[in-house]
Design a protein with these regions (language model features):
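Transmembrane alpha-helical segments of polytopic membrane transport and secretion proteins
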Residues: 1-33, 293-304
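Amphipathic cytosolic juxtamembrane alpha-helices at the membrane-cytosol interface
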Residues: 22, 101, 114-119, 187-188, ...
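C-terminal transmembrane helix and the adjacent membrane-cytosol boundary/short C-terminal tail
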Residues: 180-184, 188, 195, 262-304
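Transmembrane alpha-helices
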Residues: 178-179, 201-237
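Transmembrane alpha-helix signature in integral membrane proteins
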Residues: 80-108
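Cytoplasmic-entry segments and transmembrane alpha-helices of multi-pass inner-membrane transporters
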Residues: 101-140, 304
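Interhelical loop and adjacent transmembrane-helix boundary motif
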Residues: 235-283
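Generic hydrophobic transmembrane alpha-helix motif, especially the helices
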Residues: 126-171
Length: 304
């Protein structure tokens, strides 16, 4: 009985206006959290419901591993392996180009730049993150594509290489901003101890600061990869949009995102269902990237 009485005292009803306000705000916070959860659940259910029928009709093996896509032919073919490989190669290529540049930029901003120059570079990075995708695509189409064709002696510069270069530029803000935050969070005692033992600034940054900030840097890299694999408009303007296997950097290709974007406006029947199936595959890729991000962050927290 005594325990019950004490419990009732702890769970008291709101009495003052401040108590009522606190209760209302807590309820609003709860609703907002549940809204986010509901959005994820509804999107997931919708993607599965919309994407599974076409995979069932076409056959999962034929859909994922066939190399021919001819959705408007008399006898349509729905093989998305070229789209999957183009997305994977494009994303990996963008990471290979963008991650070293982004990481070195972050080290410079966090450790080496003077305040005035840091302000200028940070402002430029922030502006870069705010540029619309279509502007990146327009610049790539007008500058990068002709330059690639002229430099490598190709009839057209709209190819996988152009898409990789554009994506590598687009992922820089995510990598730089998150990596700078992670490097700034490294305890100064780590670096001071390294310098006191005779290490140079560069040795300290690469052997002490970067390893100590590895979980945050990894988070930035994964966020950048997520941006790259989900990009559509800019890539569609520079990649050529032909459903070819990406067997060369100079091959005109179609990515998962651009396949959906270029055909959805006129698609119908099984073709439209197949585009939803492509969206489901892309959704699974994004979910796997998010899972990888959580694993990396949890692993980094355990190490710390």
């Amino acid at each position: 009985m005594k325990n019950t009485t004490s419990s009732l005292r702890r769970v008291r009803l709101p009495r003052t206006p401040a108590d009522w306000l606190e209760a209302v705000m807590n309820f609003i916070f709860f609703l907002c959290g549940m809204l986010a959860v509901c959005c994820v659940v509804l999107i997931s259910v919708y993607m599965v419901v919309s994407g599974v029928p076409a995979i069932h009709k076409i056959g999962i093996f034929k859909f994922l591993f066939s190399t021919k896509w001819a959705s408007t032919a008399a006898e349509p073919l729905f093989g998305i392996l070229p789209f999957i490989l183009s997305s994977v190669y494009g994303t990996l290529g963008a990471a290979i180009l963008g991650v070293p540049i982004g990481l070195l930029t972050a080290v410079f901003l966090s450790k080496a730049a003077d305040p005035k120059l840091r302000t200028v570079v940070v402002t430029a990075i922030e502006l870069l993150s705010g540029i619309p995708s279509v502007v990146f695509g327009l610049l790539g189409m007008q500058v990068l594509v002709p330059a690639a064709a002229k430099t490598f002696g190709k009839a057209s510069g709209a190819c996988l290489l152009s898409a990789i270069v554009v994506l590598s530029i687009m992922i820089l803000p995510s990598i730089v901003s998150v990596s700078v935050t992670a490097l700034n969070a490294v305890p100064p005692e780590y670096e001071q101890g390294s310098l006191a033992l005779g290490a140079t600034d560069t040795e300290t940054w690469f052997k002490i600061s970067i390893p100590a900030a590895k979980s945050g840097i990894a988070a930035g890299v994964v966020l950048g990869i997520g941006r790259a694999i989900g990009e559509a408009m800019a890539v569609m303007m520079v990649a050529g949009n032909s459903p070819n296997m990406p067997d060369s950097l100079f091959r005109s290709v179609t990515l998962l995102t651009t396949a959906i974007a270029k055909e959805m406006s006129y698609a119908g029947g099984l073709q439209r269902q197949a585009l939803f199936s492509i969206a489901l595959v892309l959704f699974v890729f994004i979910m796997l990237i998010n899972v990888a991000l959580n694993v990396v962050l949890k692993g980094g927290n355990r190490d710390e």
